[in-house]
């Protein structure tokens, strides 16, 4: 799906990141970091897109320990242009320690590091709790005080936060289901941004109500991950027609629609680079 996504960015004159997470090759049978880097070298256009290593957990969705450092080191060696360490299932002190180590590796290579604090649910086995219950209780929301300390002590460049967002399932019985139409707690997001003063990241962007997404971008949310919606467009067409080129076209059209009509990002690429391109 990489080629149609990148072509959509070019045709809409927008900027984005192509991402691969451990979960996708571990459970979803996607290609691993080396194969993705090779494909990106073929299709990538540096004025429009960068390659990001997403969600490398210390403890995974099955509560198993992950040998995460070799994965991150491999990606850096392969030329990935940013990386993410996910220590969100650790306690705060452990998350800080793990993240700080990866930040040092990334910065030594001259690239930014994303980290996560709070519980962005959706990748766990089995059905999640009712969404309205989660949102009303603030279960898993990133704590403002902890976020301030976390950023100060780790030096992370981007922080993934939990403010009502949930991941889409990428494996199992739920992976083809339409995502819950999530909301975002904008006031909580604003407080997080004021406390941390770093770009915040929204994981689980597919299915979030548009009004909340747009308001979030005005309150510190700088990077929005969209995976489920693009993947499902590709897979649905592949099931219907069994023709890869048609599935790629469906992926391309969905990505262009997201860029142009949903987010209004057409023609904004130069803003990312301060008008330098």
What are these regions (language model features)?
Residues 1-24, 31-48, 59-196, 210-221, ...:
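Alpha/beta enzyme core
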Residues 27, 179, 245, 249:
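Charge-dense, low-complexity intrinsically disordered segments
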Residues 27-28, 53-58, 266, 270-271, ...:
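Metal-cofactor-binding active-site regions of metalloenzymes
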Residues 52, 114-116, 201, 258:
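Generic enzyme active-site microenvironment
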Residues 223-242, 253:
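Shared catalytic-loop signature of beta/alpha-barrel
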Residues 238-277:
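Extended, intrinsically disordered, low-complexity segments
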């Amino acid at each position: 799906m990489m080629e149609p996504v990148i072509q959509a960015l070019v045709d809409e004159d927008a900027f984005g990141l192509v991402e691969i997470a451990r979960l996708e090759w571990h459970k979803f049978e996607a290609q691993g970091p080396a194969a993705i880097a090779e494909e990106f070298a073929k299709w990538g256009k540096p004025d429009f897109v960068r390659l990001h290593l997403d969600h490398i957990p210390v403890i995974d969705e099955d509560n198993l320990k992950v040998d995460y450092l070799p994965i991150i080191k491999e990606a850096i060696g392969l030329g990935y242009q940013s990386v993410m360490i996910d220590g969100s299932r650790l306690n705060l002190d452990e998350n800080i320690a793990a993240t700080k180590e990866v930040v040092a590796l990334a910065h030594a290579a001259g690239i930014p590091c994303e980290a996560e604090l709070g519980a962005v649910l959706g990748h766990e086995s089995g059905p999640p709790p009712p969404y309205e219950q989660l949102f009303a209780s603030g279960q898993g929301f990133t704590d403002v005080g902890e976020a301030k300390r976390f950023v100060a002590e780790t030096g992370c460049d981007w922080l993934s936060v939990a403010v009502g967002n949930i991941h889409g399932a990428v494996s199992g019985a739920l992976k083809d289901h339409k995502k819950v139409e999530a909301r975002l707690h904008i006031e909580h997001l604003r407080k997080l941004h004021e406390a941390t003063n770093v770009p915040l990241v929204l994981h689980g962007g597919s299915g979030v109500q548009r009004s909340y997404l747009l308001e979030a971008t005005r309150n510190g949310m700088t990077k929005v991950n969209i995976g489920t919606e693009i993947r499902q467009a590709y897979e649905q067409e592949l099931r219907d027609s069994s023709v890869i080129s048609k599935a790629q076209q469906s992926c391309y059209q969905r990505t262009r629609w997201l860029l142009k009509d949903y987010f209004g990002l057409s023609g904004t690429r130069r803003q990312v680079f301060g008008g330098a391109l």
